């Protein structure tokens, strides 16, 4: 009798371990979509701009080639100031319809939203023996305290470069490393008055 009871108990345990190995679906949240959107060219960076709410602001773009600022840079995205009415600013990049431009987007909460294009420069990709457009973006860590009438960099958009020493095309490292090595980049930011 004890053998039958023991065998029955073991079979029940084996059956229960099979039940424990089922796969269940999880609720899909926005965090599931973010890596997929990034892979398709959507990038977004959100900033708390509550410290300058109510101030007059301009959006600025600075372009650099081989470490030197381009002659007509910096430039305003709009030819006027506007009053910042919101606490949040989102800068982002959207998939472009062609390789030679990047489509940028910004949205200042309760204030203004727009998009514009940045012209890109080709990079010779030695490993592929061809010219390509290859860029990446990342946010700056905003500095404190914020100063009036001073450019505040928020996001950089930098091209990859060929690293001859390691025989690889790359765009990695700290922001200061990338800015030293990238042959072409933009810095997007704001000024307040």
Can you describe what each PLM-predicted range is?
Residues 37-42, 52-54, 183:
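Short, surface-exposed loop/turn motifs at beta-strand boundaries within globular domains
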Residues 22-36:
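Short N-terminal segments immediately surrounding and downstream of signal-peptide cleavage
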Residues 1-25:
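Bacterial Sec-dependent N-terminal signal peptides
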Residues 46-50:
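Short edge beta-strand/loop segments characteristic of extracellular beta-sandwich folds
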Residues 53-127:
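Structured domain cores in non-transmembrane regions
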Residues 104-193:
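Extracytoplasmic electrostatic interaction patches
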Residues 45, 59, 186-188:
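Hydrophobic residues positioned within well-ordered beta-strands of beta-sheet architectures
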